[in-house]
């Protein structure tokens, strides 16, 4: 297949639309089910690069959950403990494969943003992973292959119209890429930068210790940022992104957004949330929305008389600000990556509130000294990578 016609481009009025490589070359994909759209393929091809690089950098199966050309979550296949399995809604599935754990983590980090995601998997999709995907609201998946039973499970989604794409894992794009805006062609070399432990060698803080587990988290955050719309900041812990602040025009707003998402991820692990008793038959999306409201400032939207009875079997107590603060103080050893330098120490102050202890950023600000001093204030370890990771 040398080209694939699409229903339309970004919007229904943008016709005609198609994908192709040029020079009469074959596309490196097969569409096994469904009719993926323009934005689906943008998500798929960005996501595939992300998980391919995560697998190369860590040696572990990887997954990402994409929405509107930025990842909502990304992770490698570390095992889930009982609490993680519960908050990711996979505790009823028994033992999970490493790839299934990776997708459960990627989808579970920010379930509100991942609703209707496009999934990318680094490895052949197995049955355990397909079972998780089947019951989530998702637009499609791209992987280097599918086990026969897994493919049959996925084909049952959306009445047989679920988008399933298989990509040639050996495909290598041309070293020069092009983009057209307003009839004008932009050309640049592909971002072939290898993100690995060597980038974390230049530690500029008094605390010089970055353990191996934190290095993996920093690598995950940086690779995630490489395929996130800029400006962007990523919080990571235990082999996964836990908060991604994408597409903001100021660095501090990236950090605040990513930090608030990381806080929500940790609040969902609190006894207050784990003890919620939902009514029988409530949908997964309704459950996610209710939790999001319950842990936020608008908690009365789910606790008002006449409303909570439709959601919970037993009316929950209010999760007070004091209780949330006390719980969040237990969040530690979080890693943070930034796609460009921090211009002010306020980013570090905000990061500290969400348990950040390890940071990787390019460096190069005229106020680097202030940023380093703020890290030293909290005994953080920060590496200057010397590389920027803008993505547009």
Walk through the language-model features, giving the residues of each.
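Glycine- and Gly-Pro-enriched alpha-helical subdomains that act as flexible
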Residues: 72-112, 242-341
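Active-site-proximal loop/turn and secondary-structure-junction residues that shape catalytic pockets
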Residues: 70, 125, 237-240, 342, ...
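Gly-rich Lys/Arg/Thr-decorated short loops/hinges at beta-loop-alpha junctions or inter-strand turns
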Residues: 23-35, 109-115, 189-208, 285-307, ...
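C-terminal binding/interaction regions
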Residues: 117, 121-122, 135-165, 170-172, ...
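Flexible, glycine/charged-enriched surface loops at secondary-structure junctions
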Residues: 57-65, 164-167, 230-237, 267-278, ...
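Conserved helix-loop functional segments at active or binding sites
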Residues: 53, 227, 264-268, 353, ...
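Alpha-helix N-cap/helix-initiation motif
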Residues: 36, 40, 214, 247, ...
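Active-site loops and adjacent core secondary-structure elements that bind or stabilize anionic groups
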Residues: 1-199, 214-232
């Amino acid at each position: 297949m040398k080209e694939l016609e699409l229903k339309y481009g970004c919007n229904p009025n943008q016709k005609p639309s198609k994908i192709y490589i040029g020079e009469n070359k074959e596309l490196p994909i097969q569409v096994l089910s469904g009719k993926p759209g323009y934005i689906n393929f943008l998500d798929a091809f960005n996501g595939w690069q992300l998980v391919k690089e995560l697998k190369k950098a860590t040696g572990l199966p990887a997954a990402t959950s994409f929405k509107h050309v930025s990842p909502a979550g990304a992770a490698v296949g570390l095992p889930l403990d009982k609490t993680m399995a519960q908050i990711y809604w996979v505790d009823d599935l028994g033992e999970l494969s490493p790839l299934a754990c990776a997708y459960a983590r990627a989808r579970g980090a920010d379930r509100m943003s991942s609703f209707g995601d496009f999934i990318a998997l680094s490895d052949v999709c197995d049955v355990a992973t397909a079972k998780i995907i089947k019951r989530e609201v998702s637009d499609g998946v791209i992987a280097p292959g599918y086990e026969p039973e897994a493919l049959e499970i996925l084909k049952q989604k959306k009445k047989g119209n679920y988008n399933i794409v298989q990509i040639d894992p050996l495909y290598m794009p041309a070293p020069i890429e092009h983009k057209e805006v307003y009839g004008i062609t932009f050309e640049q070399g592909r971002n072939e930068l290898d993100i690995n432990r060597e980038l974390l060698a230049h530690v500029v803080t008094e605390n010089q210790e970055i353990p191996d587990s934190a290095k993996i988290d920093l690598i995950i955050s940086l690779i995630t940022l490489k395929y996130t719309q800029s400006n962007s900041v990523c919080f990571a812990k235990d082999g996964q992104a836990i908060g991604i602040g994408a597409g903001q025009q100021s660095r501090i707003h990236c950090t605040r957004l990513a930090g608030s998402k990381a806080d929500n991820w940790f609040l969902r692990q609190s006894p207050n949330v784990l003890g919620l008793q939902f009514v029988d038959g409530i949908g997964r999306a309704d459950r996610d929305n209710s939790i999001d409201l319950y842990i936020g400032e608008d908690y009365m939207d789910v606790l008002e008389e006449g409303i909570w009875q439709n959601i919970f079997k037993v009316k929950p107590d209010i999760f007070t600000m004091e209780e949330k603060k006390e719980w969040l103080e237990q969040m530690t050893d979080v890693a943070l990556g930034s796609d460009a330098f921090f211009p002010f120490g306020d980013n570090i102050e905000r990061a500290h509130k969400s348990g950040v202890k390890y940071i990787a950023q390019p460096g190069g600000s005229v106020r680097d000294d202030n940023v380093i001093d703020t890290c030293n204030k909290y005994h953080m370890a920060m590496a200057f990578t010397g590389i920027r990771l803008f993505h547009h």
